[in-house]
């Protein structure tokens, strides 16, 4: 799940649940501007700075910052599809430090690279250092960045391991009996929803937490319990 998903976090589609970043044993990340603290890193050029989601769990707006804008610019955490600095995809919105590049403003084709996620971690301790996300196009309605849609490369730079994932947009498939139809990540301050497939006709994907077939506890930029659901 971009699922940023934010990220970001718990997020990766699947891993972007890969909007929330990779599971880590610490909440600390290194600030790329050099101030050691628990601040998120500074943004790279053209990376999105936050992931917003109107979650169907309670209809609240959840915000997952991914990086800090530079040059006195702030990253808006308000839902606004018309501010020039946002890409909206259904119930989620990506925020940018500056106006969205024109090269992004088109619907993704089936073969097009839609999203790039770059994870930095300490190569020895595996502690998460940073996440940078880059959109290349707009994922159309009824589509997402499924976990099995990405290619991954790993490189080492000094004491850091760099994991780069390239995602494609795919239309939601019909769930099979043993598929996760959606997952709910419930944190101390945020609730994140990630849809994985459409239930067959006559079935629904539950939101009641006691219906989960699997639960998993993770610590990233927050403490989350993830509830995975199957169609009923």
From Swiss-Prot:
Localization in the cell: Secreted
Keywords: Disulfide bond, Secreted, Signal, Toxin
Processing and modification events after translation: Contains 8 disulfide bonds.
Tissue specificity note: Expressed by the venom gland.
Gene Ontology molecular function: toxin activity
GO cellular component terms, semicolon-separated: extracellular region
Signal sequence coordinates: 1-21
Keyword Secreted attached: yes
Transferase among keywords: no
Family statement: Belongs to the scoloptoxin-11 family.
Protein name, per record: U-scoloptoxin(11)-Sa3a
Organism: Scolopendra alternans
């Amino acid at each position: 799940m971009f699922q940023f998903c934010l990220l970001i976090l718990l997020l990766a589609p699947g891993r972007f649940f890969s909007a929330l970043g990779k599971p880590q044993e610490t909440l600390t990340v290194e600030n790329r501007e050099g101030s050691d603290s628990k601040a998120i890193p500074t943004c790279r050029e053209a990376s999105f700075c936050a992931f917003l989601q109107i979650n169907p769990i309670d209809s609240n707006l959840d915000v997952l910052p991914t990086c800090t804008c530079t040059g006195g610019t702030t990253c808006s955490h308000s839902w606004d599809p018309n501010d020039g600095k946002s890409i909206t995809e259904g119930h989620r919105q990506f925020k940018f430090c500056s106006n969205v590049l024109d090269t992004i403003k088109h619907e993704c084709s089936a073969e097009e690279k839609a999203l790039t996620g770059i994870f930095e971690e300490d190569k020895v301790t595996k502690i998460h250092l940073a996440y940078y996300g880059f959109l290349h196009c707009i994922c159309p309605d009824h589509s997402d960045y499924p976990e099995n849609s990405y290619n991954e490369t790993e490189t080492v730079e000094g004491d850091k391991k760099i994991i780069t994932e390239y995602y494609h947009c795919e239309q939601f498939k019909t769930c099979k009996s043993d598929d996760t139809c959606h997952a709910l990540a419930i944190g101390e301050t945020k609730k994140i929803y990630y849809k994985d497939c459409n239930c067959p006709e006559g079935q629904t994907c539950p939101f009641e937490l006691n219906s989960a077939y699997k639960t998993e506890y993770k610590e990233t930029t927050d403490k989350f319990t993830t509830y995975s659901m199957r169609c009923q």
